[in-house]
């Protein structure tokens, strides 16, 4: 496939090489003599496909090496000179500049300002004996006031402290200066007395420093930071060793205990919050006045409005506003009076309109009057019988309204909520009693009802006692 075929496929018009309209294109001499540029990085056949179109990117052939840096400035000289790393060591390094400008004398290192050391106290043998004897005298006066056992242990400690010589203490302080209180290095390099432990070295160093500063200035604030106890340090290391030598099961058990403790803390906080809310609700309004002002209806209304308007207490405001009990009682009294007045009016109207009643209404009224008279007659008859005679005759007066039809007495037992009902049934099983009596007579049902009420009361009391004991254990 040639380039002309590809141009035809792509619908590109190729310039005709034959003359058109009698015009002949005469190539110039410069164009003819111009050499064609050699294309690199592209195949010749692919480049021929471009035809007379210019390529989108100028392709230039050139080397990929960096050009030589051309600089007219003279290079600055560098000198290999000496410098003092410290007072005993002299090293050499390269410095920009000639030797004439720098000089022959070695200069200090610019990093010497960062080479800081701790200020360890130094003293002579006379000074050491002076402040140590002074401190031991004050310590003996304090120890005389303590018990015999404490004195015995302190004497042992003093003997161990007095076994240190001045030369050994001086050797210890020199090591502390040399290694800047890096105690593991000090303990590793310590060769004066191999029986000393790391805690002994620390304790003796801080004990001597505390006596030194105390003799010069008793009110020095550094004295409180120089207290070191070797026994506590040993206990701390033992505890850390036990902590790091735990097994995976022990770690999991401790994590479970931590989770349980957090649960107990949350429950304790919740219980305290509930107790605070209850105490806040039971808290009466603070007033210097007597209670007699709240005995009237006007005083009760004022108290009710004051409690509603009290927004300073941190309590949850319910959307349902509580009813005023005094107003509710007044409404009940008013309704009762209205009903009485209506009944009186109805009786008067009935008496006046009695001839206008229908036959059915008259019969219903007669049956009602008959029942009323029968119940009154029955009560009058039962007045002459005592409780034993009533029980023998089986006569019972029902105060509540009985449901029509036949029913079982066991179905009239009072029921409770499911959770409370399960607790009551569990207690009845512990007492070896059935949930329903086998012989549900009237007396048995009464006793069963009383038993259920007492069990309910005991469960409620146990709940309050457990809550109170939990609160007491939390407050302790």
From Swiss-Prot:
A Pfam family that the UniProt record links to this protein: SANT_DAMP1_like
The similarity annotation says: Belongs to the SWC4 family.
Q: Predominant location of this chain? A: nucleus
Which residue ranges does the record assign to the SANT domain? 156-209
Annotated InterPro entries:
DAMP1_SANT-like, Homeodomain-like_sf, SANT/Myb, Swc4/Dmap1
What role does this protein play?
Answer: Component of the SWR1 complex which mediates the ATP-dependent exchange of histone H2A for the H2A variant HZT1 leading to transcriptional regulation of selected genes by chromatin remodeling. Component of the NuA4 histone acetyltransferase complex which is involved in transcriptional activation of selected genes principally by acetylation of nucleosomal histone H4 and H2A. The NuA4 complex is also involved in DNA repair.
Gene3D superfamilies per the UniProt record, alphabetical: Homeodomain-like
GO terms in the biological process aspect are:
chromatin remodeling; chromosome organization; DNA repair; DNA-templated transcription; negative regulation of transcription by RNA polymerase II; regulation of DNA-templated transcription
**One MF term in the entry's GO annotations:** transcription corepressor activity
Residues modified as N-acetylserine are 2
Any extra remark in the record? Present with 2230 molecules/cell in log phase SD medium.
Q: Where is the composition biased (Basic and acidic residues)?
A: 142-157
Region of interest (Disordered), residue spans: 1-40, 136-157
Q: What do we know about how this protein assembles, alone or with others?
A: Component of the SWR1 chromatin-remodeling complex composed of at least ACT1, ARP4, RVB1, RVB2, ARP6, YAF9, VPS71, VPS72, SWC3, SWC4, SWC5, SWC7 and SWR1, and perhaps BDF1. Component of the NuA4 histone acetyltransferase complex composed of at least ACT1, ARP4, YAF9, VID21, SWC4, EAF3, EAF5, EAF6, EAF7, EPL1, ESA1, TRA1 and YNG2. Interacts with YAF9. Interacts with EAF1.
NADP as UniProt keyword: no
Q: Name one GO cellular component term.
A: Swr1 complex
Polar residues composition bias: residue spans? 17-32
Top-level taxon of origin: Eukaryota
Protein's UniProt name: SWR1-complex protein 4
**SUPFAM superfamilies from the entry?**
Homeodomain-like
Q: Where in the cell is it found?
A: Nucleus
UniProt keyword list: Acetylation, Activator, Chromatin regulator, DNA damage, DNA repair, Nucleus, Transcription, Transcription regulation
């Amino acid at each position: 496939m040639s380039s002309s075929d590809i141009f035809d496929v792509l619908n590109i018009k190729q310039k005709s090489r034959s003359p058109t309209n009698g015009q002949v294109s005469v190539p110039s001499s410069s164009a003819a003599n111009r050499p064609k540029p050699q294309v690199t990085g592209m195949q010749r056949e692919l480049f021929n496909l471009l035809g007379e179109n210019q390529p989108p990117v100028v392709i230039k052939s050139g080397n990929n090496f960096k050009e030589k840096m051309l600089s007219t400035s003279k290079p600055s000289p560098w000198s290999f000179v000496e410098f003092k790393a410290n007072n005993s060591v002299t090293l050499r390094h390269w410095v920009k500049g000639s030797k004439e400008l720098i000089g022959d004398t070695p200069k200090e290192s610019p990093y010497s300002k960062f080479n800081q050391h701790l200020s360890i106290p130094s003293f002579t043998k006379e000074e050491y004996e002076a402040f140590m004897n002074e401190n031991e005298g004050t310590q003996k006066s304090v120890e005389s006031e303590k018990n015999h056992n404490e004195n015995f242990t302190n004497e042992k400690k003093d003997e161990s402290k007095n076994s240190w010589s001045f030369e050994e203490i001086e050797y210890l302080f020199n090591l502390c200066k040399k290694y800047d209180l890096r105690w593991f290095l000090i303990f590793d390099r310590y060769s004066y007395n191999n029986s000393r432990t790391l805690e002994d070295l620390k304790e003796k160093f801080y004990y001597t420093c505390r006596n030194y500063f105390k003799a010069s200035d008793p009110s020095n604030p550094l004295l409180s930071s120089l207290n070191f106890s070797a026994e506590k340090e040993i206990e701390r290391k033992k505890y850390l060793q036990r902590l790091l030598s735990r097994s995976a099961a022990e770690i999991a058990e401790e994590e479970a205990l931590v989770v349980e403790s957090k649960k107990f803390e949350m429950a304790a906080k919740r219980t305290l919050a509930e107790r605070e809310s209850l105490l806040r609700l039971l808290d009466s309004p603070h007033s210097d006045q007597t209670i007699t002002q709240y005995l009237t209806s006007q005083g009760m209304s004022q108290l009710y409005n004051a409690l509603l308007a009290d927004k300073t207490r941190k309590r949850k405001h319910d959307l349902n506003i509580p009813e005023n009990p005094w107003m509710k009682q007044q409404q009940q009294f008013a309704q009762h009076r209205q009903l009485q007045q209506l009944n009186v009016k109805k009786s008067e109207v009935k008496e006046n309109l009695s001839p206008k009643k229908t036959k059915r209404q008259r019969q219903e009224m007669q049956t009602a009057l008959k029942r009323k008279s029968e119940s009154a007659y029955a009560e009058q008859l039962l007045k002459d019988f005592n409780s034993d005679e009533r029980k023998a005759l089986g006569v019972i007066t029902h105060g509540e309204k009985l449901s029509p039809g036949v029913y079982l007495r066991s179905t009239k037992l009072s029921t409770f909520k499911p959770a409370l009902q399960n607790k009551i049934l569990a207690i009845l099983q512990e007492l070896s009693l059935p949930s329903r009596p086998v012989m549900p007579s009237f007396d048995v049902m009464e006793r069963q009802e009383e038993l259920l009420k007492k069990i309910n009361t005991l469960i409620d009391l146990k709940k309050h006692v457990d809550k109170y004991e939990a609160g007491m254990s939390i407050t302790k």
